[in-house]
Amino acid sequence: MRRTLYRLMIELTNGRFTSYILRKFAQSRLSSIIIPSYAKVFQINQDEMEKGLKEYRTLHELFTRKLKEGKRSIDTDASSIVSPVDGVFADHGPIEDTKTFDIKGKRYSIVDMLGNEERAQRYAGGTYMVIYLSPSHYHRIHSPLSGSVTERFVLGRKSYPVNAAGMEYGKEPLSKNYRSVTEVNSDGEHMALVKVGAMFVNSIELLHERDTVQKGEEMAYFTFGSTVVLLFEKDMIEVVKELKSGQELRLGEKIATRLAHK
């Protein structure tokens, strides 16, 4: 009953019109009135911001802010996979041969997440990693490795929240929400970077258009907090053992190691 009521509430309020109104407000000068309160409530680290708080004219500008030069360093080890975002490490684990994985008791389909069987088959037996971005985090997304971009595509329309309630009661938000996917071929092995939209504000802006990408290079930004899912082929990586659920991650921090193949 609780799950049904939750989903009904989301469906009734999470339409195109609602999203449009909220997006327009966030991009308007009127939204600047709540910037100080927003920064205080979400405890935004103002020392890292490229500009002073008063220089942001709209909430959208604050959401998509850049960091001061040198505030993040990208792990330079050739075998490292780095966090593509600032966020909270949610989970990681194996992708079953059935092309599914489990998070918090809910089963997710890679076929649904990527849109078809052919794409999903690449990741059967591989590894998934999930990183959650709250409204307080830096919202720009960077590449976790270097390689050639093989595909970019968008799926889904509406979005459930990706907080604890959304993960428990929502309709498989990681594989059904509005999402933008970038696939990268790195030395013959594939990784999918799945950028999952948050409730109401689905916008994910792509910034990278070249055929190749370097580790740490900026690729896109969220216009609000959301989630990133990383999918890796079988025997491609080993997740850093020290990573724990709930741990804060910073852009460029090593999260996995590429496995050597003879």
Swiss-Prot record:
Domain of life the protein comes from: Bacteria
Q: Where is this site: Cleavage (non-hydrolytic)?
A: G225, S226
Q: How is it modified after translation?
A: Is synthesized initially as an inactive proenzyme. Formation of the active enzyme involves a self-maturation process in which the active site pyruvoyl group is generated from an internal serine residue via an autocatalytic post-translational modification. Two non-identical subunits are generated from the proenzyme in this reaction, and the pyruvate is formed at the N-terminus of the alpha chain, which is derived from the carboxyl end of the proenzyme.
Location within or outside the cell: Cell membrane
Pyruvic acid (Ser) modification sites? S226
Q: Which UniProt keywords apply?
A: Cell membrane, Decarboxylase, Lipid biosynthesis, Lipid metabolism, Lyase, Membrane, Phospholipid biosynthesis, Phospholipid metabolism, Pyruvate, Zymogen
Biological pathway: Phospholipid metabolism; phosphatidylethanolamine biosynthesis; phosphatidylethanolamine from CDP-diacylglycerol: step 2/2
Free-text remark on how the cofactor is bound: Binds 1 pyruvoyl group covalently per subunit.
Q: How does this protein lie in the membrane?
A: Peripheral membrane protein
* Record-level Gene Ontology MF annotations: phosphatidylserine decarboxylase activity
Q: What is its EC number?
A: 4.1.1.65
Any GO BP annotation: phosphatidylethanolamine biosynthetic process
Q: Which cofactor(s) does the record list?
A: pyruvate
Instruction: Please name the catalytic residues of this protein.
Output: D86, H142, S226
Q: What class of enzyme is it?
A: lyase
**Main location, first listed in the record:** membrane
Q: Which GO terms describe its cellular component?
A: plasma membrane
Is DNA-binding given among the entry's keywords? no
Q: Would the keyword Nucleotide-binding turn up in this protein's UniProt record?
A: no
Q: Which InterPro entries match?
A: PS_Dcarbxylase (IPR003817), PSD-B (IPR033177), PSD_type1_pro (IPR033178)
What catalytic reaction does the record list? a 1,2-diacyl-sn-glycero-3-phospho-L-serine + H(+) = a 1,2-diacyl-sn-glycero-3-phosphoethanolamine + CO2
> Main role?
Catalyzes the formation of phosphatidylethanolamine (PtdEtn) from phosphatidylserine (PtdSer).
Q: Which PANTHER family match?
A: PHOSPHATIDYLSERINE DECARBOXYLASE, PHOSPHATIDYLSERINE DECARBOXYLASE PROENZYME, MITOCHONDRIAL
The family classification in the record reads: Belongs to the phosphatidylserine decarboxylase family. PSD-B subfamily. Prokaryotic type I sub-subfamily.
On assembly, the entry states:
Heterodimer of a large membrane-associated beta subunit and a small pyruvoyl-containing alpha subunit.
Its protein name is Phosphatidylserine decarboxylase proenzyme
Q: Which gene encodes it?
A: psd
